[in-house]
């Protein structure tokens, strides 16, 4: 029997061992040994906890030039992301990508709603004239989603300010033919041109009004500050905003057809910050040509290309100028691409290989598909992705499109893949977002690569996203990393270790041997 060692030498003894416990990420993801892996096939080994979970920073790169406070992104699917989802994803620190299975005008209007939701100084406020009718003002309220409009002599910015019209001024006015000048609030409180944002917010706190109008020395309207924006700043400290305009960040998707060029022009005009080139197989001449055109036509617009699952696919898109990559093929809960097309790759292996390659060129990657819980998100980030795109996890939330319905006593919402027949036939035209995404716009017989279904009501993302945020912080704490940057660095250096899971190990790691149980994710 070997002699018992002195307990004081335990740390030194671990240093003398031939190798650390567990596997490095390179050893884990060796396809020659283990084949293709997905998130359930491995675990991350725990590290040293010497900090509180609240200290963990989840700040990350979405693209080369856009940084988010949380690594969570909503998918551009027509049952997941429209203006409401995109708005609250941005307020909560992530970003939403508005789908394009709709008219270009409708999509641009959704982008505009997000951009108008929160501002710093509103340098281009919507202005009306004294002769605008109450009915027209009410219509503008419906169109823009708010009702605080400055009134100038000619209805234009940089003209003399004569009043302001608010929802209180018109809410109970039944005669829509009345003119704004008859019901508006005159002599509103103003601030002098040149005040700082913090000074303007202090004035708003003191005057207890809905907005502060900024004028020059001649009384001409220059810009505006909103009290609701001040409140949102307090309620949503992690919000994703443009560094220049202080508006919420908003993304959208487009296809790779010529018609999508005009769509993009409308989106950029509406204030779009980042665009996804939406294709199930991003390594195509169509996407490469579109990518080059976008970078030439809108050099300031960030472009995320994809989808890809191999280094070779990624190389073509990086060389064409992609600012970010989207990884995944056939791994979503509503996707049947791997089954039907025999193409794709297990998501863990795809994320690791593409990220390892793309990170050498400073191109952030987004893991898209196969994510079912906080653990999966943590694993995707550990394998190298900068953000994680969620479709099914956000479907069924209050902010997702569609109406709730009841089936077998359960409250449900529709959720479908963009490769489903329902999505392909949504607009009644062959060349819609769904068919172009799967290269099917000219097919007489549509081949589905997705299914249509329903998901249970998940409540609001205003509770769900903070749950994911706190869960990710706790995951990083268990691993022993104070930030996502440190997590990635320690994975590459071999300090963060992994373990491969057998089928029995996966069974052991789940709930088992209970007669019944309730799985509550958060309070």
UniProtKB/Swiss-Prot annotation:
Pfam family membership, one: CBS
Binding site for IMP: 333, 368-370, 391-392, 415-419, 449
Reaction equation(s) it catalyzes: IMP + NAD(+) + H2O = XMP + NADH + H(+)
Residues forming the catalytic site: 335, 437
UniProt key word Ion transport: no
All residue ranges annotated as the CBS domain in the record: 121-183, 184-240
UniProt name for this protein: Inosine-5'-monophosphate dehydrogenase 2
The organism of origin for this protein: Saccharomyces cerevisiae (strain ATCC 204508 / S288c)
Species lineage: Eukaryota, Fungi, Dikarya, Ascomycota, Saccharomycotina
Record gene name: IMD2
């Amino acid at each position: 029997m070997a002699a018992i060692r002195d307990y004081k030498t335990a740390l030194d003894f671990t240093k003398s061992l031939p190798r650390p416990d567990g596997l490095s990420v390179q050893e884990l993801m060796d396809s020659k040994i283990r084949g293709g892996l997905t998130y359930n096939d491995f675990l991350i080994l725990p590290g040293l906890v010497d900090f509180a979970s609240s200290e963990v920073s989840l700040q990350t790169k979405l693209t080369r030039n856009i940084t988010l406070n949380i690594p969570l992104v909503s998918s551009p699917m027509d049952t997941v992301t429209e203006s409401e989802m995109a708005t609250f994803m941005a307020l909560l620190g992530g970003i939403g990508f508005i789908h394009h299975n709709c008219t270009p005008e409708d999509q641009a209007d959704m982008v505009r709603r997000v951009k108008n939701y929160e501002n710093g100084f509103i340098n281009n406020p919507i202005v009306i004239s004294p002769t605008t009718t109450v009915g027209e003002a009410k219509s503008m309220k419906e169109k823009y989603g708010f009702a605080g409009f400055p009134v100038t002599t000619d209805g234009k910015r940089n003209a003399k300010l004569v009043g302001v019209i608010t929802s209180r001024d018109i809410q109970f006015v039944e005669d829509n033919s009345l003119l704004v000048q008859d019901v508006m609030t005159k002599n509103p409180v103003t601030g002098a041109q040149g005040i700082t944002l913090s000074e303007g917010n202090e004035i708003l706190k003191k005057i207890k009004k809905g907005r502060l109008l900024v004028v020059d020395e001649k009384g001409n309207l220059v810009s505006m500050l909103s009290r609701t924006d001040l409140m949102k700043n307090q309620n949503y400290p992690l919000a994703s905003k443009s560094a220049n305009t202080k508006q919420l960040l908003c993304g959208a998707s487009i296809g790779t057809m010529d018609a999508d060029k005009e769509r993009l022009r409308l989106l950029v005009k509406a204030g779009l910050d980042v665009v996804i080139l939406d294709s199930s197989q991003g390594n195509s001449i169509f996407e490469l040509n579109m990518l080059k055109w976008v970078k030439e036509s809108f050099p300031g617009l960030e472009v995320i290309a994809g989808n890809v699952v191999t280094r070779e696919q990624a190389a073509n898109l990086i060389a064409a100028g992609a600012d970010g990559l989207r990884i995944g093929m056939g791994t979503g809960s509503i996707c049947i691409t791997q089954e039907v097309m025999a193409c794709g790759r297990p998501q863990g292996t795809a994320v690791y290989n593409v990220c390892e390659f793309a990170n050498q060129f400073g191109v952030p990657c987004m893991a898209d598909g196969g994510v079912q819980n906080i653990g999966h998100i943590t694993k995707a980030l550990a394998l190298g992705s900068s953000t994680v795109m969620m479709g099914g996890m956000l479907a069924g939330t209050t902010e997702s499109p569609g109406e709730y319905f009841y089936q077998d006593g359960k409250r449900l919402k529709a959720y479908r893949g963009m490769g489903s027949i329902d999505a392909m036939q949504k607009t009644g035209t062959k060349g819609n977002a769904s068919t172009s995404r799967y290269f099917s716009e000219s097919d007489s017989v549509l081949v589905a690569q997705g299914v249509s279904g329903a998901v249970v009501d998940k409540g609001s993302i205003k509770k769900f996203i903070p749950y994911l945020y706190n869960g990710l912080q706790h995951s990083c704490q268990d691993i022993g990393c104070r930030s996502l940057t440190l997590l990635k660095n320690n994975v590459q250096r071999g300090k963060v270790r992994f373990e491969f899971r057998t089928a029995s190990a996966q069974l052991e790691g789940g709930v088992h041997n209970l007669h019944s149980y309730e799985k509550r994710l958060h309070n």
